[in-house]
């Protein structure tokens, strides 16, 4: 009887400690709001692409950006090491893989799994503005 009471007390304290830790971690994460119209876009090493960091560090791990493709931008065939999630805000993100082509427009969502070979680009007249989230460090590795 005493043993089960002690086990119950230890379990309860462990749960409470865990909840306090999670609560503290959540408290330290601020709400983030960034308007795509007010975001600070910076050119990237990929000509025709600019990005505005929203959270995380795209050079080190999970991150999110607003990304712009200039009109007619062509990324060529490539892969990303990590999963990428995209929601188009303006223009059209053009996507192609072995299954076919997609014109991803405003309000549309696209998930590209890490290691999946694909082509992407911007609409010839409007380009593309999209929210992009990555599960790890950003990379774009050319593929044949």
What are these model-predicted stretches?
Residues 1-10:
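Bacterial N-terminal signal peptides that target proteins for export
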Residues 9-18:
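Bacterial N-terminal signal peptides
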Residues 17-61, 144:
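A short, N-terminal "cap"/entry segment at the start of jelly-roll beta-barrel domains
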Residues 51-53, 64-66, 85, 101, ...:
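Conserved hydrophobic/aromatic beta-strand scaffold that supports enzyme active sites
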Residues 58-59, 98-116:
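Short acidic-glycine-tyrosine-enriched beta hairpin
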Residues 59-80, 113-117:
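Conserved short histidine dyad/triad with adjacent acidic residue
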Residues 70-73, 80-98:
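Glycine- and acidic-residue-biased ligand/ion/polar-headgroup-sensing regions
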Residues 114-138:
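Ligand-binding loop in jelly-roll beta-barrel domains
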